[in-house]
Amino acid sequence: MTPIVFIDRDGTLIEEPPDFQIDAYEKLRLVNGVIPALLKLRDAGYHFVIVTNQDGLGSPAYPQASFDGPNALMLQIFSSQGIVFRDVLIDRSWPTDNAPTRKPGIGLMVAYLQDRDIDWARSAMVGDRPTDLQFAENLNIRGFQLRTPQFGGDWDWDGIAHTLADAPRRAVVQRHTKETTIRVEIDLDGAPQARITTGLPFFDHMLEQIAKHAGISLQISAVGDLHIDEHHTIEDTGLALGQAVRQALGDKRGIGRYGFDPPQLPWQVSGAAAHGGFTLPMDETQASAVLDFSGRPYCVFEGTFVRERVGDMPTELVPHFFRSLCDASGMNLHLSVHGDNDHHKVEACFKALARALRQALQRHGHVLPSTKGAL
């Protein structure tokens, strides 16, 4: 789905003159900061639509020809810098006409309101007047009023671009079944912290490792049918956590996508490290994790356990948790472990996964890390 920034023209893209009509070339001046802001938003995946009231356009008071020249030059300037507008919607009525197509009315938006490919949750309206904020409210999207001497406002273009393009990646997932009730709250850019309660203290401890070593904020509350078995609680927690990660990532623009170790020198390669994954030692144990947020879930787990359980967590559910996590997050994970102590082996698996996650989740600009155009 595509987010759209709906943008007023006069006073927002171009400076508004005292007579409120840009009907001559010498009146055309861009608003400060608009081009770098739109480039940042473009790279973050936004499309742009101009929505403007042009009082009496086409009448003797405002001839069409007087409008067309400066408007065409404005569009050409933006296009020359890589900024293309998906549409230009113009209302030509007078304020006294009370036309439904005139902002803050949304009569011009009928086709967009019927478009199911628009990401309305991320879309926004930018303008210089209170009526632009009312227009945003009527569309149920976020509104930004640019700061101007004529109408006030609190925002500049740099702040708007930062707020929309660098928005925190957060998600809240609530999963209810006859067997479990689980709530996961995640902030991929928050300070590393964890509040975990699943009724299984050792499992809680392992989930805390993910938050700590992935560098994320994570809250999980799980109530399951532990009087029957641990299976449902551990499996459904993996599914809910994976769903939360997937939602928080959004369209995945700018992420590292892959989690792996830097290249190793030949004499540093041994054992599980030869797989090229994020390799982590824990005393006699070594675990390796490589992952890809490809959108194609696949989990390969290599390792065995001697004990039936570590603490209150059955060891047979360790690989099952990771498979559930992959299924719900759309992640491809290869995880291997070898060692002698089963406690060390389980903990090393969770830590290796977390460190690979840290690398894959990091943002590097706003480019989508795929030649397909979608992940």
From Swiss-Prot:
Mg(2+) binds at D8, D10, D128. Residues 1-168 are annotated as: Histidinol-phosphatase. Its main location: cytoplasm. It comes from the Bacteria. This is Histidine biosynthesis bifunctional protein HisB. The active site is at D8 (nucleophile), D10 (proton donor). Its cofactor is Mg(2+). It is found in: Cytoplasm. Keywords: Amino-acid biosynthesis, Cytoplasm, Histidine biosynthesis, Hydrolase, Lyase, Magnesium, Metal-binding, Multifunctional enzyme. GO terms for molecular function: histidinol-phosphatase activity; imidazoleglycerol-phosphate dehydratase activity; metal ion binding. It catalyses: D-erythro-1-(imidazol-4-yl)glycerol 3-phosphate = 3-(imidazol-4-yl)-2-oxopropyl phosphate + H2O; L-histidinol phosphate + H2O = L-histidinol + phosphate. PANTHER family: IMIDAZOLEGLYCEROL-PHOSPHATE DEHYDRATASE (PTHR23133:SF2), IMIDAZOLEGLYCEROL-PHOSPHATE DEHYDRATASE HIS7 (PTHR23133). It comes from Xylella fastidiosa (strain 9a5c). Pathway: Amino-acid biosynthesis; L-histidine biosynthesis; L-histidine from 5-phospho-alpha-D-ribose 1-diphosphate: step 6/9; Amino-acid biosynthesis; L-histidine biosynthesis; L-histidine from 5-phospho-alpha-D-ribose 1-diphosphate: step 8/9. PROSITE patterns: IGP_DEHYDRATASE_1, IGP_DEHYDRATASE_2. Transmembrane segments: none annotated. In the N-terminal section; belongs to the histidinol-phosphatase family. Residues 169-375 are annotated as: Imidazoleglycerol-phosphate dehydratase. HAMAP family: Bifunc_HisB, HisB. InterPro entries: HAD-like_sf, HAD-SF_hydro_IIIA, HAD_sf, His_synth_bifunc_HisB, HisB_N, Histidinol-phos, IGPD_sf, ImidazoleglycerolP_deHydtase. CDD domains: HAD_HisB-N (cd07503), IGPD (cd07914). Its EC number is 3.1.3.15, 4.2.1.19. GO terms for biological process: L-histidine biosynthetic process.
